[in-house]
Amino acid sequence: MSLVNFSMTDIARQISRPTFFLLLSVFLACTQSLDLRRLETVSMLGAELYSDSGGDSLLTGIGTRLSAEPNNLSILMEKGSALEGLRRYKEAVEIYSQCLVISPESPEILRRRGQRYISLRKLDNAITDLELAARHHTFIKAENLKYTENLNWAIWYYLALTYYLQADFENALTAFQRSYDYSADNVSLLASVNWIHNCLRRLGRSDEARQVVEPIKENMGYSGNYYKCILVYNGTKTELETINYNTVKGFEMCTIGYGMANFHWVNGDKEIALKIFRKIVAEETWQANGFLAAEAELSRIQ
């Protein structure tokens, strides 16, 4: 009997009942897990991008509280965050749209929805929201503020990223420079420096790009993937010391990989850059900024 013609009954005859039912339960669990994944959007390259499965118990608890207070912005925003964590960005956008009916000029809600429009590859929508957020927000420089709490920085940073994805490097540079001005911790500072450098290199302003990254050195208390990129940009480290393309995965692959690929691209090594771009978009972390950037690069040369 050909293996491809095996039915569940055929398999059951070949193995013990306990083993059969164990295998069946595993198969059904896997199938249900796959069914819970939702199609979120289509990439700039035409690939289908899916949400994560699970999280129902958390959402059920939030839903119970919302049923008692359906217009409670705090609970609605909590639900939006939970949906983001599951990469259910379409539903998160719907929640933030509901929030904006209640508070239509909220810079924080506009920023959150704008950021998730980026994840959904709706870049024009993202720019509209993020420009509105900048218009309605009162920017006051803060000190020692974690990047996740720094709305000043986040508005400019994600607006800049959207321009960058559209290859509008002049506007991206201006917005990234503003994000740098409002950075209040090492993470936000290094992220802004990284992208300012990339914009300047794309604009052919190599001397300025070197000046931006030159002050960042080892043993300054910095860390993270953007820091690793910057040390390559300024010649402190080599690419070989920084990333192993055979082992690195996920966000690290997307962030450092894009930085290195872009560095190759502006230095004229475009075939190497393209190879890395393609490796990045083979990852599962399709929400990562580096993934988005690599995807945008490849979409422009198809």
What do these predicted ranges mean?
Residues 30-78, 85-86, 302:
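N-terminal leader/linker segments that initiate helical-solenoid repeat arrays
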Residues 63-70, 135-149, 181-186, 245-246:
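Flexible helix-coil transition and linker loops at the boundaries of alpha-helical arrays
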Residues 81, 115, 161, 198-200, ...:
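Residue-level recognition of tetratricopeptide repeat
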